[in-house]
A protein has these predicted regions:
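ABC ATPase nucleotide-binding domain helices that frame the ATP-binding cleft
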Residues: 41-44, 140-141
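Non-catalytic connector elements of ABC transporters
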Residues: 13, 25, 35, 249-386
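Helix-to-loop junction immediately C-terminal to a conserved catalytic motif
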Residues: 48
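Conserved coupling/switch loops of ABC nucleotide-binding domains, chiefly the family-specific signature
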Residues: 54-57, 208, 355
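Conserved ABC transporter NBD signature motif
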Residues: 56-64
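Short beta-strand immediately N-terminal to the Walker A/P-loop
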Residues: 30-32
Length: 386
């Protein structure tokens, strides 16, 4: 099974919603990751046939479906909201797409409803109505309805976003095992980097209606090709600092460290490789908050004098907001509960091994200092906060 989008464009009210989207997705799960307003829901609505594109083609398993109506597309859609028929029981909600198909006998419908309900862990709730269910049970019902009828493409638009943490973790694990090896194309959208890493599936990063990158999520996390990709896979947000590469060193706020070799190795003039001597070039340094420490660092660690502005304690972590050089904001994510006094001075430490060096526009990763590669064979072990 394959879903192919070729040059798909969509413009509404004078704004570009989708800009030349070209993707080829095969059977199994693919993650669609990006911030709010990236175009994730819009892209799914176009694939489902709810929004006609202004240009481009959509094919499913070799058949052009660009102009095919919603009813005639072999597509199921699960929304972020718990969308179920309130007057129908769980059983009837799941059975509804099967009855519309009108090609299954009653016994076949009953068997399929019960199979899917058991798969989703709601087999004992078939007689209840949606109002009698918890949020997690309602979303399981919505997903069961989407799974009831075999489809070529299954679209899940942030299906866990409205659930509490415990339910989200439980259902995420269930969905991951359920869709591994699926014969359908399963496109799952999320704005949560941790969710993308947990599913360990091929990933499309979307931003401002454009495809930013396609690849393995662990590799993108370890060595993001652009600042936009790094930002999409970082929560809390990245810390960004201005820097200059000069004479083979990276300079930042009075500190410096040897410029690492270009990533990927440069095949163009020496100025593209920060480790080589060449004209000075402005760069952007990015570091994740959990790689900023307070109170000490090892050999070669960069030290930044800072003023404490705010300490946010969440229980498992303390987010320390700092001001560098009187103008730059830096956040340190520290383990556990730690107490700090706003207005006091401290020193923030960053190991250059955890810095990404981007060009001044953030459009290209120039270097990733000794950032260890993450095995794509065990992507689920990637820890977003450690």
């Amino acid at each position: 099974m394959a879903l192919i989008l070729d040059g798909v464009r969509l413009r509404r009210r004078g704004e570009i919603w989708l800009d030349d989207i070209s993707l080829e997705l095969s059977s199994g799960m693919t993650m669609l990751v990006g911030p709010m307003s990236a175009g994730k829901t819009t892209l799914m609505r176009v694939v489902a046939g709810l929004l006609p594109p202004d240009a481009g083609r959509i094919t499913v398993n070799g058949t052009d479906v660009t102009s095919v109506s919603v009813r005639k597309r072999s597509v199921a859609f699960v929304y972020q909201q718990f969308i179920n028929y309130p007057s129908l029981s769980v059983y009837e909600n799941i059975a509804s797409p099967l009855r519309l198909a009108r090609d299954l006998p009653r016994a076949g419908i009953d068997r399929r409803v019960r199979e899917v309900a058991e798969l989703m862990g709601i087999g004992d709730l078939l007689g209840r109505r949606p109002a009698e269910l918890s949020g997690g049970q309602q979303q399981r019902t919505a997903i069961a309805r989407a799974l009831a009828r075999p489809v070529d493409v299954l679209l899940l638009d942030e299906p866990l976003a409205n659930l509490d943490f415990k339910l989200r973790e439980q259902l995420r694990a269930d969905l991951r095992s359920m869709f591994q090896g699926s014969s359908s194309v399963v496109l799952y959208s999320t704005a949560d980097p941790a969710e993308a890493l947990t599913f360990a599936a091929p990933t499309v990063v979307l931003g401002e209606g454009r495809v930013r990158h396609v690849g393995e999520v662990a590799e993108m996390y370890a060595r993001p090709p652009t600042l936009a990709v790094a930002a999409a896979l970082s929560d809390p947000p990245l810390n960004l600092l201005p820097g200059v590469v000069r004479a083979g060193r990276v300079e930042c706020l009075g500190t410096s460290f040897p410029a690492p070799p270009a990533h990927p190795p440069a095949h163009s003039p020496a100025q593209d490789d920060p480790a080589q001597d060449g004209p000075a070039q402005d760069v952007v340094l990015a570091v994740r908050p959990h790689h900023v420490t307070i109170g000490g660092g090892g050999p070669g660690t960069l030290a930044f004098p800072a003023e404490i502005r705010l300490a946010e304690v969440t229980g498992s972590a303390t987010f320390l907001h700092l001001l560098l050089a009187g103008r730059l904001h830096l956040v340190a994510q520290l383990p556990g509960t730690q107490l700090f006094v706003p207005g006091e001075s401290t020193t923030a430490f960053v190991d250059p091994a955890h810095l990404f060096v981007f060009d001044e526009n953030g459009g290209r990763l120039l270097a990733a200092s000794a950032v260890s590669a993450v095995s794509t064979a065990s992507t689920a072990e990637v820890d977003l906060h450690g």
